[in-house]
Amino acid sequence: MSKLILAINAGSSSLKFQLIRMPEEELVTKGLIERIGLKDSIFTIEVNGEKVKTVQDIKDHVEAVDIMLDAFKAHNIINDINDIVGTGHRVVHGGEKFPESVAITDEVEKEIEELSELAPLHNPANLMGIRAFRKLLPNIPHVAIFDTAFHQTMPEKAYLYSLPYHYYKDYGIRKYGFHGTSHKFVSQRAAEMLDKPIEDLRIISCHIGNGASIAAIDGGKSIDTSMGFTPLAGVTMGTRSGNIDPALIPFIMEKTGKTAEQVLEILNKESGLLGLSGTSSDLRDLSEEAESGKARSQMALDVFASKIHKYIGSYAARMHGVDVIVFTAGIGENSVEIRAKVLEGLEFMGVYWDPKKNENLLRGKEGFINYPHSPVKVVVIPTDEESMIARDVMTFGGLK
């Protein structure tokens, strides 16, 4: 029998939602509430394929959830509030405490709060959503799905930094990795598309959007990933630097008189594609500029692709080979150019890809871009974190 599950992503002043029919994984409706706690909050919901937008003051997340549930009934999306049997909440950081999704109790809520020091911008906001739903829908399971959980299978040699060991023991300083829900979804989907058990596959998953991370997935388990203690580490991103020499931070402070916080702000919000190009963090803008002859925009694209290319080689070495390379997220799904740059020269690894197939796969299309004879398969898979969240609600909420 079908069940309706809500997949939730709560920000400090926003609430993104999808109502999904399970186990069919059919989207019933989706929407966004913005400017919560501010004047003129915006509520957008999809009804019969059309976006319906209203502007009203919404004082907090509890009121936002209340308005959303009322809208479901008003638009005949549900008959009754009891039609919704579970909610799944994206939580950015689960630390070492949560190696998998978990049904939310008061104790779990408290532990998510304690982990806020590892994700001060996100965990408190995620908790606002959790508390609102637990208050208004007290009789159904609520499940926390952590961005970090999928990577908790990494071995020590992958997650430890070469710092004095007590920093790890005392402060939890280690690589955690992010985008776990996306990497988990696309790796499972790749196995389905190949009609092979995931246990038999070595997958390199490239989640490339404004934020980007690469994961080495061996037998369905993450054994390494490019992001680190925070989502700042790894490859070049839209506005984030990715990996740099740590000694640059005091050097920049000394040269510019900036504080550590100001330098961190630069690394997070003024670097990456934006910093390199000097014009934009949006890959589409940079591609146009590069075509019109802007050398810095071309250089930014080259650096961006080069870092991803390097991780693919590194992770192939970590897994003693690779069977599948997956591209997903906004850029991975839609940029023919970046995929081509990333794959260039990988023939030595057994990667043979078809430029025509590559050009045809964008705007939500799924498929292989390798030649049939290629030992390594290359696949574009639109990510669907909400479906993964809904699956985990079914599993960990005891609804199967």
Curated annotation (Swiss-Prot):
ATP binds at K16, H207, I208, G209, N210, G211, D282, L283, R284, G330, I331, G332, E333, N334. It is found in: Cytoplasm. Disulfide bonds: none annotated. GO terms for cellular component: cytoplasm. It catalyses: acetate + ATP = acetyl phosphate + ADP. Mg(2+). Can also accept Mn(2+). Its EC number is 2.7.2.1. Mg(2+) binds at N9, E385. One of its GO terms (biological process) is acetyl-CoA biosynthetic process. Pathway: Metabolic intermediate biosynthesis; acetyl-CoA biosynthesis; acetyl-CoA from acetate: step 1/2. SUPFAM superfamilies: Actin-like ATPase domain. InterPro entries: Ac/propionate_kinase (IPR004372), Aliphatic_acid_kin_short-chain (IPR000890), Aliphatic_acid_kinase_CS (IPR023865), ATPase_NBD (IPR043129). One of its GO terms (molecular function) is acetate kinase activity. HAMAP family: Acetate_kinase. Catalyzes the formation of acetyl phosphate from acetate and ATP. Can also catalyze the reverse reaction. This is Acetate kinase. It comes from Staphylococcus aureus (strain Mu3 / ATCC 700698).
